[in-house]
Regions:
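Structural/interface elements that position substrates and couple domains in central-metabolism enzymes
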Residues: 1-445
Length: 445
């Protein structure tokens, strides 16, 4: 039986693990398998990534080059653009992007492309796992029929499961091995074998009754966050209107030991999950005639935060008798969260675009991001790229306004407070001590 054969391969670590997509999810995953004794083949369409891995270099903050080098040198890890190597894998895990179309509908093209490559080269006796975030039903409605078209039967010829990735880039406390793993198969055998596989590298595995439960689990997690961040952002705007310190309110509320979980406002939401996942859930809801109002309201509030930040900047400049048009604006941090280089859906990009459209002279400093490019299709201002500027005293002193969009720890905020004439702090990066000792006009979210 396929279940018994795969179980034996997994337990004795002779199974070859294939991972399609070597980004923030796929690279840490395959390295973890290789460090635990498995042979891994990473599949990637980006030749530069393949070259870097082959040379023993990591391009992901959560994976050290030392670990990549070790896995490559001992023959456990190879990276390739040749998808025919899928035939040599006993397990194939899909870790590809799942973006949105311009219409905010799910873009399934990456999952479908990965499925088509598997379909070409699959053989009997393989376990396929989808980790990419998607709507409930994708695993059994999209992938299963593709594999069965080849004449293979579930449980007899292949197994199929979904296990949502839970990567938190730049979080050293939670890495692949200690983030609990939810696993749901299209069949009971699929669940059992997939759970066994992940138990080899993850401390805690939580099997569920179906792939759809696992798919819905991930969307529930991130929709919960998006909605609560939306509430925090709305409360911040209300507190500003009332002249109340938003951050002090949150700190006070967080002293309640039950029934409250602290969420914090910001310039908007970014990353590969929070801005996108609720749309997958609401899209699926619409297919069944269900109107997910909470999701829509949260998206409206969160997507409006960059414009609100620009409004704060405009008002602050007006207060010192300056217009946005022609003002020199310095953006501190363009990554979507601190201490990483990931700019996906970063609200800083929207803020830059809105300010450029109003005639501001924009520069940015981010120790992790050397260059920012803009998609012409989504840009209302200039679409020319920007390049990282060194954070010199003159740059801060000569800026009409400094906007803290991302609170990277490497930035010297004391120096910023000493030199910048006007600061808009969207992340509560400036302590009370720094604010009180500064001559700058400081506006906080």
């Amino acid at each position: 039986m396929i279940k018994n054969d795969l179980t034996e391969l997994i337990v004795d670590k002779s199974a070859c693990i294939g991972v399609i997509g070597l980004g923030y999810v796929g690279l840490p995953l395959i390295v973890e398998f290789c460090l635990n004794g498995y042979r891994g083949i990473g599949f990637e369409v980006d030749t530069k990534k393949v070259e870097q891995i082959t040379a023993g270099h990591s391009y992901i903050v959560d994976v050290t080059s030392e670990n990549v080098q070790q896995c490559v040198n001992n023959g456990k890890l190879t990276a390739t653009t040749d998808f025919s190597e899928l035939a040599n894998c006993d397990v194939i895990i899909i870790c590809v992007p799942t973006p949105l179309r311009k219409t905010k509908d799910p873009d399934m093209s990456y999952i479908i492309a990965a499925g088509e490559e598997i379909q070409k080269y699959m053989r009997r006796g393989q376990l396929m796992i989808l980790e990419s975030t998607t709507y409930p039903g994708t695993t059994d409605e999209v992938l299963q029929p593709m594999f069965e078209e080849k004449g293979f039967q579930l449980d007899e010829d292949f197994l199929l499961a979904f296990s949502p990735e839970r990567v938190d880039p730049g979080n050293p406390q939670y890495q692949t091995h200690n983030i609990p793993k939810v696993v749901g198969g299209v069949s009971d055998d699929s669940t059992e074998v997939a759970a066994l596989l992940y138990r080899q590298i993850v401390n805690e595995v939580h099997p569920v009754s179906s792939a759809r439960v696992a798919e819905a689990c991930k969307l529930w997690e991130n929709t919960f966050r998006a909605i609560n961040i939306g509430m925090a952002n709305e409360m911040a705007r209300l507190c500003n209107t009332l002249g109340i310190d938003t951050w002090e309110v949150v700190r006070a509320a967080a002293t309640k030991p039950f029934g409250f979980m602290a969420f914090y406002p910001g310039p908007g939401i970014g990353g590969h999950c929070i801005p996108l996942d609720p749309h997958y859930l609401s899209w699926k809801a619409r297919q069944h005639g269900f109107d997910s109002q909470f999701i829509s309201l949260a998206e409206q509030v969160n997507s409006g935060m960059p414009a609100y930040v620009v409004k704060l900047v405009s008002t602050a400049l007006n207060d010192v008798k300056k217009a946005v048009n022609g003002s020199k604006v310095l953006i501190l941090g363009v990554a979507y969260k601190k201490d990483i280089d990931d700019m996906r859906e970063s609200p800083a990009l929207s803020i830059i675009d809105l300010l450029r459209a109003r005639g501001a002279d924009l520069v940015y400093h981010d120790p992790f991001v050397p260059e920012v490019t803009f998609d012409h299709a989504y840009t209302i201002g200039e679409a020319e790229p920007l390049y990282n500027s060194e954070l010199t005293d003159d740059l801060m002193r000569n800026s009409d306004c400094v906007i803290i969009c991302t609170e990277h720890t490497d930035i010297d905020y004391r120096r910023v407070c000493e030199l910048a004439p006007l600061i808009v702090d969207t992340r509560n990066a400036l302590s009370a001590e720094l604010r009180n000792g500064s001559n700058a006009k400081i506006v906080r979210l």
